[in-house]
Amino acid sequence: MPQTALVLASTLGPGCSAQGRPGMGERGARGSEDLVFQDGRLVSGSLEALMEHLVPTADYYPDRTYIFTFLLSSRVFIRPHDLLARVGRICLEQRRQLEAGPEKAKLKCFSARVVQLLKEWTEAFPYDFQDETVMAELKAITHRVAQCDEEGGTVKKAIAQMTQSLPLALAARGQRQELRDKLCSPALDRGPVLKAKPPAAQKDILGVCCDPLVLAQQLTHIELERVGSIRPEDLMQILSHMDSRDKHRCRGDPAKTRSLEAYDDWFDCLSMLVATEVVKKKHRTRVLEFLIDVARECFNIGNFNSMMAIISGMNLSPVARLKKTWSKVKTAKFDVLEHHMDPSSNFCNYRTALQGAMQRSQTANSSREKVVIPVFNLFVKDMYFLHKIHTNHLPNGHVNFKKFWEISRQIHEFMAWTQVECPFEKDKKIQSYLLTAPVYSEEALFVASFESEGPENHMEKDSWKALRTTLLNRA
């Protein structure tokens, strides 16, 4: 996200630039007692002072990075619609002061800045405005600030543009959600009811695609489509779930976690699909080598999430125990992949590779070099670690805004990766197979695995015996 935007520069008039730096201008000076800065950067403050710092005046407009960070992090402490109501009251107070004071001429400039703030809010977090009561509050605020403008004036035009764009953004999100739900439902329901042995005519991955690069490209398509539906506030919702001591009311909103759960489920489905493809009777060695090549191509593309899912599928017990099969596989490539995903030293090797992909993306000469899809589970763990080692509040009661600057930076970085347009041609046939192909349940995976290579030790023999007994009793 750019440091500054002049989206409504034409509405502000001479001397009313939308630019501003954290802590600069009238608002920053007035709130200095409740706001703490280090090297010109806001690091803490009371929630009330932070809210006042968000609202522009006739002579002050907050930095855009502060707007994004505060709107994102404030939901840990206050619901968005409550924040909007508070912003409305502060704006009304400002307007009354301008009307009663000697600077009434600045009223239009102030109104334009308020609309600019609301516009940035609706663009960055349109989901905050899906409720009718919030929309009513938004209309009430804009109605009040627009009273100083003539009919057809710049402020009223900006308000009209904002109110027209917001429903479109909400509708687009709803359409993406419906599409994702259609794709997710079969994948989540298919596993437990499947038999161990597939019909002879059932397709397998090699029958659908025999080119590792093409399959890696289609996996990248699916990744970007799914991760692209995640919004910044969805990620912030993770923090609301983490702290069991936090009694904040908006925790657990299913609508704000559905995108995250769907993306997490995709990882599990891909891992199970990999395991299913391997334990099928025919061509196990060939399938393993093919999938290793697919994982390597994912790594080269920058699709680390699919790569990790493939490796995870190969490391599931029903696959990992197939010693005879693995003995025939040329594992040098797999060893390299496991080295990149080695969990030691906090996944140091993976983080080095991710940093390299990020640098490549920043200096990309082609769209193919821009792809960066991190391992989502590790990103969430990093967020969790950052959340746990830093408190939300300082001993003096101030919000620890330094913490939320860092959280916002990481979320913004993640969101930038999700907005990359997939540079590869879409193959509907391959994607359909990846998304809808039947996968084995955990029990079925073990049945197929033991039927391919019998149990080799007492523990495996006991497990196989118990599994057969369970299946016979169920039948």
Tell where the protein language model's regions lie, with residue ranges.
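Eukaryotic small-GTPase/lipid signaling interfaces
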Residues: 1-475
